[in-house]
Curated annotation (Swiss-Prot):
Its main location: nucleus. It holds the Pfam family CENP-B_N. Residues 12-63 form the HTH psq-type domain. The keyword Phosphoprotein does not apply. Residues 433-448 have a biased composition (Basic and acidic residues). Residues 39-59, 108-139 bind DNA. Residues 75-146 form the HTH CENPB-type domain. The keyword Nucleus applies. GO terms for cellular component: nucleus. This is Tigger transposable element-derived protein 4. It comes from Mus musculus (Mouse).
Length: 513
């Protein structure tokens, strides 16, 4: 009995090793299941148990995401992610761009760039050790080899390389609703057709020549479903027309040049980041490479993607029709307000607050079709849209132009509404060169001591601004009543009815003044 026990105990025990599958193999299994093939046959083909196959299907979304976004080497067998996810994404993005531009990358370069990104992203405790670098290379299947030097004599256009090899990575990683482009443009917000000649071709590089200039920063997503709130940068931190104003439909900032600065851009991105965090979204925002657009630390929901400096700013989607549409609509409204004053024999007044309200109104009127077409013109993939709404804007404005001329408004000979809207397109919107810390500190100190433009300087002798008393609660309710009586004589949808009711309820809830 004892001998039998010893014999059994000494017999070799065979333990079947659990088979590990690569991500590519898991993708093949998922495709086979979804094509209708029997699960038993699939399990037998790949040498796995049925419960392992069920586990793969349960984690299908994770496997597909890892494969489609190229976050992992397809030969890898585990999907364990890193602690510094944002750092790894930035580093891989940089590595892919370097590959596309035929820039050889080695371990020391990657370590240097990893530490650089860590500082920019706020990971001050991170140090790129050999162990971390080896694990990173393993996760993404990176192998550094000597790059052969080939003198082909063929010049490569960096912009073509970027569009063909870099942009697709972003568009693969993000849904069109989460792909944004942001762009600045200058605006002479009081410029009428009667005084266009003085501004034609003006760059306003020092911010002193044009008293009525502002900078707009605007952005939309790729499918045209979302427009970011406008950012307006003026010269006066607290203009007289803003007195008593507690809220605006836009973001408003100011400095003495009415330019975008690194500080304003950083604050704006942080506000937008909070908004997208609340929506539990992850977005990419494309911006020009310039001193006013720095890397912004600690963004959790926004990835900033910088157009390479070799690309002209004209390639930005906003420059392909969105800005044009907004400005045509704005000039259209400005002329209408001017005509109303002329025909009623009243002095024309138009303040910065009027400009803010008009811009907000016109921004809401820019159509999704215009936005989608602009992205297509900029080289971004998008469903085809054939509506040329920018031209439609111009066509609508032709009748107004004829009306204006008939009322005695002088247009420059041959000046179209499109040319009128584009006269300020050359205005500079940011500092051309990077300032050092001492210069920025000095400028901030000067601004704090009152070097913002004063009301007197901005008003142009007061001819185009007027102080209006703040209406009472009773006045506001009376105005809502007048609006309701007017709208009842027109077809009104449920949404507008609801908006009117919400407006009246909001006013009623305010304390009487």
């Amino acid at each position: 009995m004892a001998e039998a026990s010893v014999d059994i105990g000494t017999q070799p025990v065979t333990v079947k090793k659990k088979k590990s599958l690569s991500i590519e193999e898991k993708i093949d299994i998922i495709n086979a299941v979804e094509s209708g093939k029997k699960k038993a046959e699939i399990a037998a083909e790949y040498g796995i148990k049925k419960n392992s196959l069920s586990s793969i299907m349960k984690n299908k979304d994770k496997v597909l995401e890892a494969f489609e976004s190229l976050r992992f080497d397809p030969k890898r067998k585990r999907l364990r992610t890193a602690f510094y996810t944002d750092l790894e994404e930035a580093l891989m993005r940089w590595y892919r761009i370097a590959q596309c531009l035929n820039v050889p990358v080695n371990g020391p370069m990657l370590r240097l760039k990893a530490n650089d990104f860590a500082q920019k992203l706020g990971h001050n405790d991170f140090k790129c050790s050999n162990g971390w670098l080896d694990r990173f290379k393993s996760r993404y299947g990176l192998v550094f080899r000597a790059q052969p030097v080939e003198a082909t004599g063929i010049s490569i256009d960096p912009s073509t390389v970027w569009y063909q090899n870099v942009l697709p990575y972003y568009l693969n990683d993000y849904h069109p609703k989460n792909v944004f482009n942001v762009k600045e443009t200058g605006l002479l917000y009081r410029m009428l057709p009667t005084n266009t000649f003085a501004f034609k071709g003006e760059t306003c590089s020092v911010g002193k020549l044009c008293k009525d200039r502002i900078t707009l920063a605007l952005g939309t997503n790729m499918d045209g479903s979302e427009k970011l709130p406008l950012l307006i940068i003026g010269k006066n931190r607290a203009p007289r027309c803003f007195k008593g104003i507690k809220s605006l439909p836009v973001y408003y900032e100011a400095n003495r040049t009415a330019w975008m600065t690194a500080a304003i851009f950083e604050q704006w991105m942080q506000k937008l980041d909070e908004k997208f965090q609340a929506q539990k979204r992850r977005v990419v925002i494309f911006v020009d490479s310039c001193p006013a657009h720095p890397e912004v630390k600690n963004l959790k929901s926004i990835e900033l993607a910088f157009f390479p400096s070799c690309l002209s700013s004209g390639f930005a989607a906003m420059n392909q029709g969105v800005i044009k549409s907004l400005k045509i609509k704005y000039r259209h409204c400005l002329i209408k307000k001017f005509l109303s004053s002329v025909e009623s024999s009243k002095e024309f007044t138009f303040s910065l607050l009027d400009a803010v309200d008009t811009l907000h109104l016109c921004w809401r009127a820019v159509t999704p079709e215009t936005i989608v077409k602009s992205y297509e013109e900029a080289g971004f993939r998008s469903p085809k849209g054939e509506n040329d709404t920018a031209n439609a804007d111009a066509a609508v404005a032709l009748d107004l132009t004829a009306h204006a001329v008939g009322a005695g408004v002088e247009f420059l000979e041959g000046l179209s509404i499109e040319e009128y809207a584009a006269l300020d397109e050359d205005l500079e919107t940011c500092e051309a060169t990077q300032k050092d810390d001492a210069e920025w500190a000095g400028e901030s100190k000067q601004d704090e001591t009152g070097l913002y433009t004063s009301d007197e300087e901005e008003e142009d002798s007061g001819a185009l601004e007027v102080d209006l008393p703040s209406p009472s609660k009773k006045d506001a309710l009376s105005a809502v009543g007048t609006l309701k009586r007017f709208l009842r004589s027109h077809d009104l949808n449920d949404e507008l009815h609801g908006s009117l009711a919400d407006l009246e309820n909001f006013i009623n809830a305010l304390s009487p003044k």
